């Protein structure tokens, strides 16, 4: 997908001002390819971008946190980078930031099962791909997961209020607890509703009933 340099610079400028690490996992619509925006734009020092379809990890010792993920390097990915892998240190806060599809094992968008997620051993998985994400939160073993959805709905296949997830992960020696809440961003929204227009003879009368 195309993005202007002005938009990219606006986004990276905001990234540089947030005062915390930013992790990016390129997906099927913005893969990490030769000549892509990921290579053309210099990211701020606090931004880390996954660049391989093989599992990678960014470590933040000051936060006692490891973040695992990968990048799409084309428009499709049928491999499962998390399969047959596990976290390096269960004593740390272990997060996953990834573009993945938990709806079908035959998906061409990095299929991911709850069994694979559970065996990997992370504490929380921040997932992208599904824009209507309200029904895609849960637990896989000791790992909580959620899809972030999209910031703003763009059509009638993205109905309802949209926004971002704010997640707090607390971990002690025994277990981790992820608290997830939604922060609304959309000022407008798309809705799919049914309206009884019985008796309406003109477009104006239909509009009045709506």
Region annotations inferred by a language model:
Residues 54-63, 147-210:
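Binuclear metal-dependent phosphoesterase catalytic core
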Residues 2-161, 168:
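His/Asp/Glu-rich metal-coordinating catalytic cores
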């Amino acid at each position: 997908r195309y993005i202007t340099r002005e938009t990219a610079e606006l986004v990276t400028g905001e990234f540089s001002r947030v005062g915390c690490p930013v992790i990016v996992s390129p997906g099927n619509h913005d893969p990490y390819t030769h000549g892509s925006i990921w290579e053309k734009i210099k990211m701020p020092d606090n931004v880390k971008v996954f660049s391989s379809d093989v599992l990678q990890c960014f470590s933040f010792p000051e936060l006692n946190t490891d973040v695992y993920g990968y990048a799409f390097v084309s428009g499709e990915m049928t491999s499962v980078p998390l399969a047959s892998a596990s976290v390096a240190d269960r004593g740390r806060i272990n997060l996953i930031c990834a573009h993945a599809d938990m709806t079908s094992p035959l998906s061409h968008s990095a299929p991911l099962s709850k069994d694979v997620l559970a065996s990997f051993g992370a504490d929380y998985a921040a997932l992208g791909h599904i824009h209507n994400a309200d029904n895609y939160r849960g637990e896989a073993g000791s790992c909580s997961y959620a899809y972030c959805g999209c910031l703003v709905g763009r059509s009638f296949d993205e109905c309802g209020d949209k926004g971002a997830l704010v997640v707090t992960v607390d971990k002690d020696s025994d277990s981790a607890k992820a608290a997830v809440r939604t922060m609304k961003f959309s000022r407008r929204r798309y809705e799919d509703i049914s309206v009884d227009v019985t008796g309406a003879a003109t477009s104006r009368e239909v509009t009045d009933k709506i």
